[in-house]
Amino acid sequence: MAEQDFVEEVLRFLTARMQIEAEWAVQEQTSFTWWAHTLAQRVWVAPAREFQGVALRTLHIETDLLTGVPMTTSTWARLASMNRFATLSAYVAETKAGAVRLHSSVSLTADNFLLARTIALHAMALQMADAFAESAELAEALGGRVDATPHPRQGLRERPDEMVGILEIYEQRGEGDSPFDADEIAGLVHLEPRPWRLASNDVLQLAADLDFADDMPARLELDAAARHTALGSGLQMRLLLPLEPDDLIAQKLNANESLEPDAHQLGAWCVDGERGLMFTGFIPAAAYMPGLSRALVYHLSAKNEWARALLFPAG
């Protein structure tokens, strides 16, 4: 399929599956904005570029949360802590605008767009539902105000779309065991080409060392035994960097990845008291697809290279 064709197909797919009403949307050729309630959600496809010899289009998903947030060290610390519980999006501060938004992205290619569009759909749905549920409480915690905006023709949407209640479906699907089973996790150890120095697996868990610094590898972890506090079963993914924990670096990584990532951004950079500076995300059971865990391993490996180049450009 031609590049422009699959971009248009992905946007049509997301619009249809999210059941977006035309009257509450603004459509453009490679983007759309819609209002499920008072918070705008934007979906757009960035211009084409080449990455490792492959033509790539990045599909971004972003939902407004707060405006008027003071950009202080306290804000960085709160965001770095909040992002420890990320599912498929990051809380990202836009410093010049004093705004906090939810953001995620997927990398689209002619070979992967069918899988990528589906995980993008889940990121879009969870983002929209989380924004609806959390915005008022976050405004109080971070000192800003809810970034409610009107549709340019319809005005402010007073009655929320039924889709804002979609979290219940994810919660129900997460009541059972993870669909990422032991055989699937064990099989990842034998991936070729190998993206790591060394990898091992336990029941439902994978751990691998990735090149980062000469004697300090980064750590990739997948854990299908982990359960999300709200969504239940699925797959926890982590990328731990061998660096001192720093709230501002976590914000820098999230902000830069929201501009031009080299891999799927399905989660967030954060600071954890035990694990330090890391990227984390959670794939809920309802988002399971064959081949997804394999793709995530390679995207986490690419994310590691991207972070190393950003933080140590001369290295």
Label for each model-derived stretch:
Residues 1-44, 84-99, 103, 111-117, ...:
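Charge-rich, low-complexity N-terminal segments
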Residues 125-132, 301:
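Generic structural signal for well-ordered, non-transmembrane alpha-helical segments
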Residues 65-69, 106-110, 212, 241-243, ...:
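Beta-strand elements of well-folded, non-transmembrane domains
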Residues 3-7, 11, 72-76, 178, ...:
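Generic alpha-helical secondary structure
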Residues 90-125, 136-140, 264-297, 309-313:
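Well-ordered alpha/beta subsegment
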Residues 28-30, 34-68, 204-240:
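Hydrophobic-cavity lipid-handling domains and compact docking modules
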Residues 58-99, 229-280:
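Short, internal acidic amphipathic alpha-helical interface segments
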